[in-house]
Amino acid sequence: MGWLVLAAGQSRRFGADKLTAQMRDGRALLAHTLAALTATEQPLLAVVRPGHNAVTALLDRLDVPYTVCPHAEAGMGASLAWGVSQVKDWMFCGVALADMPYIRSGTLAALHERGGEERIVAPFYHERQGHPVIFGRRFYPQLMALGGDAGAKSVLQRYSDALLRLDVEDRGVLCDVDTPDDIHEARQEGVAYSLS
């Protein structure tokens, strides 16, 4: 098992490269996301877009392997399909979004413990489904068939009988960063506990 980190987005709403944007401690947003994932002691593979040199340089510094998705501009579905095609030997993979730096490592460990080849595991915070989502190898063909900007929602809906809910008290599973204000709002709401 390992974590597939989707880091190939364009950051259009952020207005700059959000993955290398500095958090309050001076580290990059992506570094925070990766720190929590690394704490689970599971393999990581980041999916990046061609020419995203600032992100690949950061991944090199952090010693995180990555794969360049040649069709990343097509959207998240294309990046996810490409990433899954690179980790077909994993019994299950956690699909993590690079712009979600507030998830507790304990939540990630609990998700990992429940993963399996035949199931999907998703965190829920107060009845709202969050990220990351773990997919067993059974679902890799469906994930590899995705394209465009459609993420894994269709797979989740089609195989809802295989979904294992993990209720968590971790609002970070819902908090992504799309704009600079998202970082400020998360701090105001006390979500930034993982930024120590």
Where are these regions (language model features)?
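Glycine-rich phosphate-binding loop of ATP-grasp-fold ATP-dependent ligases
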Residues: 129-131, 173-174
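Structured alpha-helical
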Residues: 136
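Residues that recognize and position ribonucleotide moieties
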Residues: 101, 133, 176
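A generic structural signal for short hydrophobic patches within well-formed alpha-helices
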Residues: 108, 139-143, 152, 183
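Conserved alpha/beta core of the MobA/IspD/sugar-nucleotide pyrophosphorylase nucleotidyltransferase superfamily
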Residues: 1-3, 147-196
